[in-house]
Design a protein with these regions (language model features):
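Sec-dependent signal peptide recognition
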Residues: 3-8
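Short, cysteine-centered beta-strand-loop-beta hairpins and adjacent loop/turn segments enriched
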Residues: 45-51, 84-89, 150-161
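Short, solvent-exposed loop/hinge segments that bridge or flank secondary-structure elements
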Residues: 40-81
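Edge beta-strand at a domain terminus
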Residues: 97, 143-177
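Hydrophobic helical h-region of N-terminal Sec-dependent signal peptides
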Residues: 9-15
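Bacterial Sec-dependent N-terminal signal peptides
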Residues: 2, 15-41, 169-177
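Contiguous, well-ordered beta-strand patches that form the walls/edges
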Residues: 46, 69-144, 170-172
Length: 177
């Protein structure tokens, strides 16, 4: 009888180690669903009125097409998510004043860093991110996510408007561990 009890106690560390391996596998699987290089697929202005920030006379809620049509240089708007942290590029439009008092709109990249946490609940895991600014991050499927955040942009009449913008990102390249 005492040998059986000794064997049972000797097996406890083995079973605990198995549970930890299972958690590590689950954590890795959850991170694997989101790891990669992403591009913005769409960005929708959620304000009351449509925007005409490029001054072409066509107001729209398609924030990303308005944003890309501004003639203010080019940019690479890729986002990177790895094991420990995430860099998400938020398209922002800024107003810059020249030395003579004139103003112009420029395209700007606003980098926000978040930290990836994998929450394990029962037999499933989900990815959560915490950002410096108020951002709603939602993992919507394998290799895609959405981000909603407030953006302030000037319109073509010089007024600033602030409203949420919902951006959808899709993975264009997988990043290994």
């Amino acid at each position: 009888m005492s040998k059986k009890i000794i064997h049972i106690f000797a097996m406890i560390p083995f079973f605990c180690a198995c549970e930890k391996v299972w958690e590590a596998d689950l954590r890795e699987k959850a991170l694997d669903t989101i790891r990669g290089i992403y591009e913005i697929e769409s960005a929708v202005w959620e304000g009351q009125e449509p925007l005409d920030i490029n001054g072409d006379g066509n107001a729209t809620f398609d924030y990303y097409s308005e944003y890309l049509s501004i003639d203010a240089g080019t940019g690479d708007y890729k986002s990177y998510i790895n094991n420990k942290s995430a860099s998400i590029m938020i398209p922002v439009i800024s107003r810059v004043y020249g030395y003579n008092g004139s103003e112009r709109l420029i395209r700007d990249r606003w980098e926000i860093t978040g930290y990836t946490n994998v929450l394990i609940e029962g037999e499933s895991a989900r990815v959560e991110m915490t950002f410096e600014k108020n951002i709603e991050f939602k993992h919507t499927g394998y290799g895609e996510f959405t981000v909603r955040t407030d953006v302030t942009v000037p319109d073509n009449q010089g007024r600033d408007s602030t409203a949420p913008v919902l951006m959808k990102f899709i993975r264009v390249n997988y990043l290994g561990k």
